[in-house]
């Protein structure tokens, strides 16, 4: 565990602010307190032995305790100032342990070559897999696959061909996603690596090309949410039920763009297998999170020991030659657990949620939305006919999942004279293993054969129906139940179909019965009333038993909050002191020290990338900048083009830029010659694409709310010229807003834009930054 002491200068400031904060608190209570009185009170605290011990502990405590997420990012951040400890909100340059690309490897390669790169910075950092369109045998797709394989061979990259398995599963079973490391992938379900204690998070193609060429890209550390599990899962309830319930019960964007850390008592976490954790972590993507991290604990250690033993016996590879045996070794395992990374006591979380697993029952997601989750029992009563069932995807198609599905048919065989029953008439049941090793394991147990005997249709190991590709897609009017991770309208076929998500046993039972149903393994506990969940850690204050150390940590945490409040007051009331003591942000040469403009307000939340740049232009590569400027925001407001002017600052509501990953959503705004976008919050991919393409952005909820207070009454105006102006002082990390001629003027602190990100924007975006870095 990393540790650090407060520097003398940092401690001095901490005490100064704490004195100031305590003084103001005391003044608010007495209305007559003076600084001299405060000093006397403070001195009296030091004379009390208990208080003296507290302040002594505060003296030697860590300056800012880190979450597990922050600790891992700390390890893989480069170019940090000496003594810098990263925290949520920081922009950092990261050098990830691994970077995986799949079928999009060829577009990444084209981008890589277009920037003048000729060799990979570190071939061992890169993994390439073919998994998405593996059923497509067209000449065009096979040519692309050959090009990817040739590129990988030329550059010495570990490559996994079509049919070997899904990239995320390969990252896990081949040891690329190693506990305590940072791994990225150009795919949204890289969150899955968190199931083995590896911080996995998605990147876009330009980022991947940057990692290939330089070994690095950038990342803004998200706010971190702690999710505490209590109790243990009842028989018949699975990890899929856990994450489906979380998506449906906390469905107000509770963890949108957060990094999640799952925790719980030793008993609770011991009850969650690695396969269960992988399922939960995988679907944190659908919950809106950027990562889903489980602890590095005894459960994981046992799983890794099994992998290391298998590798040492030469059994890890099967018919496939890999280097897994070099990654799964007992010496590496012992080294990992000598001092495993954990969150510091007192680490700050943006929010805390809890779920009592013992109160959970089987859940089903949908139709056509992960935000709709219903207890299976309620849906069974509706006799919903099922046309297609799917045991596929990286979420739930490992050997343990296949075994659970096979068990449904094996139990039914006991009532059928020992003969495996067939799936219901009119139902098609598709199965595809997450990888060939998982399929081989299922075959070794006889489970794969059981499903085939029941009438299942085998698909190649890889993606397929779950991403709307290949055989078995839903037709108009059909109903499907799938063990995959995403069920929005049209995802698995027709937009006129209904898609539900459930556990492997629910999928199997539904295929067998012909209607949405379960195997009957779950029995409602006596006295059950509801799923127990909420904010916090779920421990009632009257039940909270704290050790002296924990009580001290709690008090220190409360004092740290008081310090933070005092710093805010200190900053607002004594700006000169703030600047001299905290310093100013360094400005990268060529980056503007100030950005100013008139505010044009698009008053809407969830403006998606299709609203910003119409989809019909997305795959036209020859659209000139003038046309991009003209169609910018066209699907949101056709009048935007004539209302917004060059040099304006665009302000919109919350979750601006959600939706697809099209880079043109950023470049179209730049084509309109708007240099800065301000919103209540941004979609994560839009944020990445903005910086990668040199568009500046600020999150200022206060400004959005103030604009709505001022202009909210009367007729709705989609795009409004406000007459307000904003000046962003980059050095001070502060904006100044002038509410029209003669109106109020106010300032507000904003997040720091550090020099490493300024450099990317000043160079004209990430591609040009990479060109400069490699001397192309």
Curated annotation (Swiss-Prot):
Claim: S-adenosyl-L-methionine is one of the keywords in the record: no
Record pathway: Amino-acid biosynthesis; L-lysine biosynthesis via AAA pathway; L-alpha-aminoadipate from 2-oxoglutarate: step 3/5
pH dependence: Optimum pH is 8.1-8.6.
Range of residues in the leader sequence: none
Reaction equations catalysed: (2R,3S)-homoisocitrate = cis-homoaconitate + H2O
The record's free-text note on cofactor binding: Binds 1 [4Fe-4S] cluster per subunit.
Name used for this protein in its record: Homoaconitase, mitochondrial
CDD domains for the chain: Homoaconitase, Homoaconitase_Swivel
Xref: InterPro entries: Acnase/IPM_dHydase_lsu_aba_1/3 (IPR015931), Acoase/IPM_deHydtase_lsu_aba (IPR001030), Aconitase/3IPM_dehydase_swvl (IPR015928), Aconitase_4Fe-4S_BS (IPR018136), Aconitase_4Fe-4S_dom (IPR036008), AconitaseA/IPMdHydase_ssu_swvl (IPR000573), Homoaconitase_mito (IPR004418), Homoaconitase_swivel (IPR039386)
Free-text function comment from the UniProt entry: Catalyzes the reversible hydration of cis-homoaconitate to (2R,3S)-homoisocitrate, a step in the alpha-aminoadipate pathway for lysine biosynthesis.
Recorded name of the encoding gene: lys4
A Pfam family per the record: Aconitase
PROSITE patterns found in the cross-reference section: ACONITASE_1, ACONITASE_2
The entry's keywords: Amino-acid biosynthesis, Iron, Iron-sulfur, Lyase, Lysine biosynthesis, Metal-binding, Mitochondrion, Transit peptide
UniProt-annotated binding residues for [4Fe-4S] cluster: 394, 463, 466
Subcellular location as annotated: Mitochondrion
């Amino acid at each position: 565990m990393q540790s650090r002491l407060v520097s003398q200068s940092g401690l001095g400031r901490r005490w100064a602010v704490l004195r100031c904060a305590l003084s103001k608190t005391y003044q608010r209570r007495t209305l007559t307190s003076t600084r001299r009185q405060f000093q006397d009170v403070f001195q009296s605290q030091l004379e009390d032995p208990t208080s003296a011990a507290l302040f002594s502990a505060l003296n030697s405590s860590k300056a800012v305790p880190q979450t597990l997420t922050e600790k891992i990012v700390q390890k893989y951040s480069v170019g940090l100032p000496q003594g810098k400890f990263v925290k949520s909100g920081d922009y950092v340059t990261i050098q990830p342990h691994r970077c995986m690309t799949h079928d999009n490897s060829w577009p990444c390669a084209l981008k890589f070559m277009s920037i003048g790169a000729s060799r990979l910075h570190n071939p061992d950092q890169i993994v390439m897999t073919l998994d998405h369109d593996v059923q497509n045998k067209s000449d065009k797709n096979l040519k692309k696959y050959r090009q990817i394989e040739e590129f990988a061979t030329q550059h010495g990259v570990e490559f996994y061909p079509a049919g070997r398995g899904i990239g995320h599963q390969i990252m896990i079973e081949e040891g690329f996603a190693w506990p305590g490391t940072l791994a990225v992938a150009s795919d949204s379900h890289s969150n899955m690596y968190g199931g083995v204690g590896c911080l996995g998070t998605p990147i876009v193609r330009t980022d991947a090309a940057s990692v290939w060429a330089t070994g690095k890209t950038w990342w803004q550390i998200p706010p971190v949410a702690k999710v505490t599990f209590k109790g243990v899962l009842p028989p018949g309830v699975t990890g899929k039920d856990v994450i489906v319930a979380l998506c449906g019960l906390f469905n107000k964007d509770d963890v949108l763009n957060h990094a999640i850390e799952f925790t719980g008592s030793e008993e609770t976490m011991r009850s969650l297998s690695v396969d269960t954790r992988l399922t939960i972590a995988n679907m944190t993507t659908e919950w809106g999170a950027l990562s889903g991290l489980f602890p590095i604990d005894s459960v994981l250690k046992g799983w890794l020991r099994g992998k290391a033993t298998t590798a040492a016996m030469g059994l890890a590879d099967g018919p496939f030659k890999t280097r897994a045996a070099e990654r799964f070794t007992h010496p590496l395992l012992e080294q990992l657990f000598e001092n495993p990374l954990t969150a510091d006591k007192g680490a700050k979380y943006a929010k805390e949620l809890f779920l009592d697993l013992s109160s959970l029952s089987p859940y089903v997601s949908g139709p056509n939305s992960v935000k709709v989750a219903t207890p299976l029992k309620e849906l069974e009563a509706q006799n919903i006919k099922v046309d297609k069932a799917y045991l596929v995807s990286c979420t739930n198609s490992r050997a343990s999942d296949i075994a659970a599905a096979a068990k449904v048919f094996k139990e039914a065989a006991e009532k059928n004279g020992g003969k495996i029953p067939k799936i219901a008439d009119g139902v098609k049941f598709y199965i595809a293993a997450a990888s060939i090793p998982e399929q081989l394991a299922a075959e070794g147990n006889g489970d794969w054969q059981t499903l085939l005997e029941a009438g299942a249709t085998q698909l190649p190991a890889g993606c397929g129906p779950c991403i709307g590709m290949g055989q078995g897609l839903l037709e108009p009017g059909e109903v499907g139940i799938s063990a995959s991770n995403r069920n929005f309208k049209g995802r698995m076929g027709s937009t006129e179909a209904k898609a539900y998500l459930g556990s492997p046993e629910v999928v199997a039972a539904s295929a067998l019965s012909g209607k949405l149903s379960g195997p009957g393994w779950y029995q409602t506990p006596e006295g059950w009333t509801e799923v127990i969940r909420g904010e916090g850690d779920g421990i009632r204050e009257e039940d909270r038993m704290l050790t002296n150390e924990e009580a001290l940590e709690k008090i220190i945490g409360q004092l740290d909050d008081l310090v933070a409040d005092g710093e805010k007051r200190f900053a607002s009331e004594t700006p000169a002191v703030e600047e001299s003591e905290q310093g100013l942000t360094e400005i990268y040469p060529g980056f503007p020290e100030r950005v100013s403009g008139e505010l044009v307000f698009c008053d809407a939340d969830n403006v998606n990338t299709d609203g910003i740049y119409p989809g019909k232009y997305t795959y036209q590569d020859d659209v000139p900048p003038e046309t991009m400027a003209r169609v910018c925001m066209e699907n949101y407001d056709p009048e935007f083009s004539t209302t917004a002017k060059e040099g304006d600052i665009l302000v919109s509501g919350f979750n601006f830029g959600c939706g697809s990953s099209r880079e043109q959503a950023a470049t179209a705004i730049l084509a309109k010659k708007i240099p800065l976008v301000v919103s209540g919050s941004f979609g994560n991919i839009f944020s990445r694409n903005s910086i990668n393409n040199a568009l500046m952005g600020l999150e200022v909820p206060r400004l959005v709310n103030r604009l709505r207070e001022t202009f909210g009454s009367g007729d709705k105006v989609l795009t409004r010229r406000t007459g307000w102006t904003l000046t962003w002082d980059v050095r001070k990390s502060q904006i100044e807003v002038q509410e029209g001629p003669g109106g109020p003027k106010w300032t507000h602190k904003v997040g720091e834009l550090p020099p490493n990100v300024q450099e990317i924007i000043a160079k004209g975006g990430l591609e040009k930054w990479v060109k400069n870095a490699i001397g192309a």
